[in-house]
Swiss-Prot record:
<feature type="region of interest" description="Basic motif">
    <location>
        <begin position="159"/>
        <end position="180"/>
    </location>
</feature>
<feature type="region of interest" description="n-CRD">
    <location>
        <begin position="284"/>
        <end position="296"/>
    </location>
</feature>
<feature type="compositionally biased region" description="Low complexity">
    <location>
        <begin position="336"/>
        <end position="362"/>
    </location>
</feature>
<keyword id="KW-0539">Nucleus</keyword>
<keyword id="KW-1015">Disulfide bond</keyword>
<feature type="region of interest" description="Disordered">
    <location>
        <begin position="23"/>
        <end position="179"/>
    </location>
</feature>
<dbReference type="GO" id="GO:0090575">
    <property type="term" value="C:RNA polymerase II transcription regulator complex"/>
</dbReference>
<feature type="short sequence motif" description="Bipartite nuclear localization signal">
    <location>
        <begin position="35"/>
        <end position="42"/>
    </location>
</feature>
<feature type="compositionally biased region" description="Basic and acidic residues">
    <location>
        <begin position="36"/>
        <end position="48"/>
    </location>
</feature>
<dbReference type="GO" id="GO:0000976">
    <property type="term" value="F:transcription cis-regulatory region binding"/>
</dbReference>
<comment type="similarity">
    <text>Belongs to the bZIP family. YAP subfamily.</text>
</comment>
<feature type="region of interest" description="Transcription activation 2">
    <location>
        <begin position="377"/>
        <end position="459"/>
    </location>
</feature>
<feature type="region of interest" description="c-CRD">
    <location>
        <begin position="510"/>
        <end position="543"/>
    </location>
</feature>
<feature type="short sequence motif" description="Nuclear export signal">
    <location>
        <begin position="528"/>
        <end position="535"/>
    </location>
</feature>
<feature type="disulfide bond" description="In nuclear retained form; alternate">
    <location>
        <begin position="510"/>
        <end position="534"/>
    </location>
</feature>
<comment type="function">
    <text>Transcription activator involved in oxidative stress response and redox homeostasis. Regulates the transcription of genes encoding antioxidant enzymes and components of the cellular thiol-reducing pathways.</text>
</comment>
<keyword id="KW-0238">DNA-binding</keyword>
Length: 563
């Protein structure tokens, strides 16, 4: 039995050709061969009772009969005597699993199988990548999923979201409220700015209007100061509407004198009657006293008839009861001149016109000499009976009276006692007639100019009153006083752009008045009518170089009434 086993083992070996084919197949497909060797090893381990055909090529051993070194092994040794298949079972199958891979394939089929092997390799690598990705995911999932009960995180997240929404809602509300407040503030500031701009526009227009008026008044003042003495009153706009009747042939104009300064005192006849009673016939010249000078009026002369009483009927008839001599009055001289000239062709209108033009000629404004004044012409009228010179209104009245007299009446009736004049009015009113009361009336032109312009013309043009002693008698003897430089004074006043004649320390500005008003307790309590107070202060306000000011006395009076 031992010999059979040894012979069996020696007969189960490959020939050299078979070995070459086996090596070629193994070398051409080495990686699959390794896998197959691994499989064979695993099968050999799992199945130890397998046949020798199942042995791996790594454990291949040459049989003793195949080895040439041994004697008797020159051939295969498959002789009739040495056949190993004497007791061989013919039903033995030599095809074990995987035996087709032990022998190399044909050359024509190698590329296709190599391509298939490449695809298999690619598929295997892909499968390995997919399996590795799955394993990584499974490992990540296992790392994330820790054992134990998971906490409930749904409630805190919802609560946090609700808090965030509430905070955002509150922030939006605050932002909208802030924007609304800013819009209201902008509207209020815009309205205040519009009101301030409107008020500034009104104030600016008022200031411009005041400046225009100031320039207009300065122009008028410059016209008055730069114009000549003759045409000074022509600068006033309404002066042309004040032309007197009968002066159209004379360019000279003058402001109508006051009632108490009317020329021609013989109209009132007071001085003449008084001089007839007090002066002898051989007295001195009429210029010795004011009571003898015609044109000078006093309170005593106006009321002289009250002291003396009414003239008697005999005096009215031309018979004088006073034996004292009388001075020839200007009235009688004029009456005689008018009686001698009654036959001339001089009409009352022309005589009154010439009389008025002669009365307007005064010292310094008329080209004629002083000898041609009405006072000297009165003396000339005694000698020249044919001259039509009527210096007063009494001349016209005397002429009309002389014409109306009958031839049977003597002419010396007018030489004895003159007419009562205005003394009759004083007697009718019970002695209460006072012409000075009518001197306060002025022309409407004074409302345009300031109150100081009334004295301005008296100082700028010092013309003596018509009928005054200085005009009639002293115009040659007395020299004129030096005139004031009123133009320089006016220029100085115009340069000072401040409130004239006002003490700056006594003036209160608007801020000071407001501070004083805020210090009052009634103002803080709201008990003071601010509108009424402002209207009263506005009436007392004045303009100055520093703004609107109010006199301190006026402010104290208004504040005192409020308290």
């Amino acid at each position: 039995m031992a010999d059979y086993n040894t012979l069996y083992h020696q007969g189960l070996y490959l020939s050299p050709d078979q070995q070459d084919l086996l090596l070629a197949a193994l070398s051409s497909n080495q990686p699959p061969q390794k896998q197959q060797n691994d499989k064979q090893r695993s099968q050999a381990k799992t199945d130890p009772d397998s046949t020798p055909g199942n042995m791996s090529s790594g454990s291949f051993s040459m049989s003793p009969g195949f080895n040439k070194t041994h004697p008797g092994s020159g051939g295969l040794g498959y002789g009739d005597d040495e056949s190993p298949f004497l007791d061989f079972n013919p039903e033995l199958d030599f095809d074990f699993p995987g035996s087709e891979n032990l022998i190399g394939d044909l050359p024509g089929s190698l590329p296709s199988e190599e391509h298939e092997v490449g695809e298999k390799r690619k598929d295997m690598s892909d499968n390995e990548n997919e399996e590795s990705g799955k394993k990584r995911r499974e490992s990540d999932d296992k790392a994330a999923k820790k054992p134990g009960r998971k906490p409930l995180t749904s409630e805190p997240t919802s609560k946090r979201k609700a808090q965030n929404r509430a905070a955002q809602r509150a922030f939006r509300e605050r932002k909208e409220k802030h924007l609304k407040d800013l819009e209201t503030k902008v509207d209020e500031l815009q309205k205040a700015s519009d009101d301030a701009n409107q008020e500034n526009g009104l104030l600016r227009a008022q200031v411009e209007r005041l400046q225009v008026e100031l320039r207009e008044y300065r122009k008028r003042l410059s016209w008055l100061t730069t114009g000549s003495g003759i045409s000074a009153m022509s600068a006033i706009p309404s002066a042309h509407s004040r032309n007197l009747y009968g002066l159209n042939n004379n360019d000279f104009m003058f402001d109508f004198p006051k009632f108490g300064d009317l020329p021609g005192g013989h109209i009132f006849n007071g001085p003449l009657t008084k001089s007839n009673q007090n002066k002898p016939r051989d007295g001195s010249s009429p210029a010795t006293s004011d009571s003898q000078v015609p044109g000078v009026m006093t309170r005593e002369t106006l009321n002289g008839s009250n002291n003396r009483g009414m003239p008697t009927a005999k005096a009215a008839n031309g018979v004088s009861n006073n034996p004292s001599p009388k001075v020839p009055s200007v009235y009688n001289i004029r009456q005689s001149a008018s009686s001698h000239d009654s036959s001339n062709s001089c009409s009352p209108s022309s005589s009154s016109d010439s009389h008025q033009s002669q009365m307007l000629s005064s010292n310094g404004t008329s080209p004629e000499p002083s000898s041609n004044s009405p006072a000297t012409k009165l003396n000339d009228s005694v000698q020249n009976h044919h001259a039509c010179t009527y210096s007063t209104i009494d001349a016209v009245r005397g002429k009309s009276e002389s014409v109306s007299n009958t031839p049977s009446q003597p002419n010396n009736n007018y030489e004895q006692t003159p007419g009562p004049g205005l003394d009759l009015l004083a007697q009718q009113n019970g002695g209460q007639f006072d012409p000075v009361l009518f001197g306060d009336w002025r022309e409407p032109q004074d409302a345009i100019l300031s109150q100081d312009f009334g004295t301005f013309f008296d100082d700028a043009f010092p013309l003596p009153d018509l009928g005054s002693p200085s005009h009639n008698f002293n115009e040659v003897a007395n020299p004129q006083p030096p005139k004031k430089d009123l133009i320089a004074e006016i220029d100085n006043k115009l340069d000072e752009e401040v409130v004239p004649g006002e003490d700056k320390s006594q003036m209160l500005s608007c801020t000071k008045i407001w501070d004083r008003l805020q210090s009052m307790e009634k103002f803080r309590n709201g008990e003071i009518d601010v509108d009424n107070l402002c209207s009263e202060l506005r009436t007392k306000a004045r303009c100055s170089e520093g703004g609107v000011v109010v006199n301190q006395k006026d402010v104290e009076d208004i504040m005192g009434r409020v308290k």
